[in-house]
Amino acid sequence: MSNKRRYFGTDGVRGKVGQYPITPDFVLKLGWAAGRVLAKQGTKKVIIGKDTRISGYMLESALEAGLAAAGLKATFTGPMPTPAVAYLTQTFRAEAGIVISASHNPYYDNGIKFFSSEGTKLPDDIELAIEAELDKDIECVESSELGKATRLNDAAGRYIEFCKSTFPSTLSLSNLKIVVDCAHGATYHIAPNVFKELGADVIAMGVEPNGININEEVGATDVRALQKRVVEEQAHLGLAFDGDGDRIIMVDHLGNKVDGDQIAYIIARDALRRGELKGGVVGTLMTNLGMENGLKQLGIPFVRAAVGDRYVMEQLLAKGWKIGAENSGHVILLDKVTTGDAIVAALQVLASVVGSDMSLHDLSQGMTLYPQVLENVRFAGENNPLEAQAVLAAVEEVEAELGDKGRVLLRKSGTEPLIRVMVEGEDAELVQSSALKIADAVKASC
């Protein structure tokens, strides 16, 4: 069996709807191939959730048909955050959980990602086994062994109660006014209720999904509307979730953005204060230097993983640590959940706000973010612009200018045809001009 993946990226199979591999025929075969592999594992039962994209209906049907042909039973949750599917997969002792979502991407993209029976990303050997089955012709099981589909009507209620259970029972949100932006995505019917039931005065936005407005100028990838609303409503803070509920970005009462690095810092510092910090914190190559320095001042160990929550998780498991994060808002808290869970992460920050009687603004001041600029350059073709001489020369020149007061990172996106250029350092103007210089070199080499 080849170790090279053809379909699975860093976060499952993803692409533009209607273009290979996100087509009804491929997804049907993917369901069958996954069903063949999973059927050998045990219960022959899977949980299927999705976000609010219009294409979810089509892909859900195709996926279930493939699974049924392989003899697996599917339980549909309807629109449900990705971490909720991971949780429900565990509680129902299902063989796997499947999420139909493209997370923070626009509505015209979609994807399929899998969770193991433990609520974690599928092991590499299972993904490779599924890819091997995709090379075979579909063979339907005997009619008496075909799978069937059922619907889980109380999925949202179950997950809401789980989220609330991660918030200290001695605390309440009754003195907080919170603006909650659900990105017209999978948390729209869940997140506002979690915070309301814990006592908060909730102002909800991004809770009117129509199939094509997911992540559109709302949510964790675009917090401008939330920043404006928090200030207008004189709220204590704002919470922005992405389309599938695994990313969280916060906004303080002054309208300042609080990103994944700052959120992880607040959670780690609070755990240290309570004597409950188990080990250190895992970030990524994109984690701001300010977080690394802030943790160092507290005596908290820190390591960087490759970009992607899969790699953060690998480092956490290898070290036995419990807190990992990406600045984009993926926050993994292994003492509470098995994957990145935006609602649960938000609740831990709110527990710190209430427990310390400090504002989100004040809590986030413990670390100073370095100016950081990210430029995305779209590319196509077989050539690798990262190896182009002009790009290497531009990087070398910028690194010499920054010295030990900044850093440069170039990488290919794991989910889109993009080269990501990141520059950070103490001097904001130098950082901006340096990022543009490298991005121009990448564009010229594409």
Curated annotation (Swiss-Prot):
CDD domains: GlmM (cd05802). Its EC number is 5.4.2.10. Mg(2+) binds at S103, D242, D244, D246. Pfam families: PGM_PMM_I, PGM_PMM_II, PGM_PMM_III, PGM_PMM_IV. HAMAP family: GlmM_B (MF_01554_B). Catalyzes the conversion of glucosamine-6-phosphate to glucosamine-1-phosphate. Gene3D superfamilies: Alpha-D-Glucose-1,6-Bisphosphate, subunit A, domain 3 (3.40.120.10), Alpha-D-phosphohexomutase, C-terminal domain (3.30.310.50). Its cofactor is Mg(2+). It comes from the Bacteria. GO terms for cellular component: cytosol. It comes from Vibrio parahaemolyticus serotype O3:K6 (strain RIMD 2210633). PANTHER family: PHOSPHOGLUCOMUTASE (ALPHA-D-GLUCOSE-1,6-BISPHOSPHATE-DEPENDENT), PHOSPHOHEXOSE MUTASE. Transmembrane segments: none annotated. The modification Phosphoserine is found at S103. InterPro entries: A-D-PHexomutase_a/b/a-I (IPR005844), A-D-PHexomutase_a/b/a-I/II/III (IPR016055), A-D-PHexomutase_a/b/a-II (IPR005845), A-D-PHexomutase_a/b/a-III (IPR005846), A-D-PHexomutase_C (IPR005843), A-D-PHexomutase_C_sf (IPR036900), A-D-PHexomutase_CS (IPR016066), Alpha-D-phosphohexomutase_SF (IPR005841). PROSITE patterns: PGM_PMM. It catalyses: alpha-D-glucosamine 1-phosphate = D-glucosamine 6-phosphate. Activated by phosphorylation. The active site is at S103 (phosphoserine intermediate). Belongs to the phosphohexose mutase family. This is Phosphoglucosamine mutase. GO terms for biological process: carbohydrate metabolic process; peptidoglycan biosynthetic process; UDP-N-acetylglucosamine biosynthetic process. Keywords: Isomerase, Magnesium, Metal-binding, Phosphoprotein. One of its GO terms (molecular function) is phosphomannomutase activity. Binds 1 Mg(2+) ion per subunit.
